[in-house]
Amino acid sequence: MNKILLTGSDGQLGTDLLRLLKNEGIGVAPFTMKTLDITGREKVLKAVRDERPSVIVNCAAYTNVDKAEIEKDLAFAVNRDGAAHLAEAAFAVDAPIIHISTDYVFDGSKSTPYVETDETNPLGVYGESKLAGEEEIRKLHPGHIIIRTSWLYGAHGHNFVKTILRLASERESLRVVYDQTGAPTWTEDLASAIIHAVRAAVKGNAPYGTYHYANEGVTSWYDFSLSIVEEAKGMGSQLRCKTIAPILTSEYPAPAKRPPYSVFDKGKIRKTFNMTIPHWKASLRNMLNILYGGTNA
């Protein structure tokens, strides 16, 4: 029987992926950071030997972009070393590894969508640590699928959508950056894309390599926040927020630099796995329906 070893199973992506895997009838051995600390090499090797999975999916990551600037060692321990340990363990049991990465491996200096072969140039520690993790996986295990994603949000965990909803319930006016452009990605859509890759890996005909995945469409954080509040109000949410003002990144100083342009070309993953990618507006609506309705689509 095929079994997936899933790390980060209680994170915002891992939670949705675990549920979808179970719904699909796919056997899964879920691990949280508490039940498997991926920074410990021997622990990872033992867990993988014990489980003998068909595929490993790594959703575990250090994702606090600003805090990474002062917690560099921890960010690299999780995002580089943890990824390396999982790749080594996967190779030892002849299991492919699917690993989630980020738009932060790029500097955002382009003005056209990023393809997988574009030059990487992270602006901060978080992006550096994630890129280092990618490089370790490529070095240690040819049977890998690396999926970079951007602006991830979901019903679980901490993310931009839930932060905007919280602030909009507390304040009458908000200020949101408008000069950073990208594509929001709903965790449930990314989880569905990962399952496409899992099925190919289980069959033994997975086209290994690096892929880009985000929802269709392009927006700014400012316009995204407008849509969040508008959709939530349309669903009956009693938000106090009446106005959202656009501001420059320079008006909102943060410890870590953000890429100003994080738009992906998704042609490779769409064609390779024959998948349909929903528009971010439709996915935002679906996520808010779940958040307010308490059900999963």
Task: Annotate the PLM regions.
Residues A155, Q180-A191, Y211-E231, N286:
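Substrate-binding strand-loop-helix patch
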Residues A200-P253:
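Mid/C-terminal beta-alpha module of Rossmann-like enzyme folds, strongest
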Residues R41-R80, A89:
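NAD(P)H-binding glycine-rich loop region in Rossmannoid oxidoreductase-like domains
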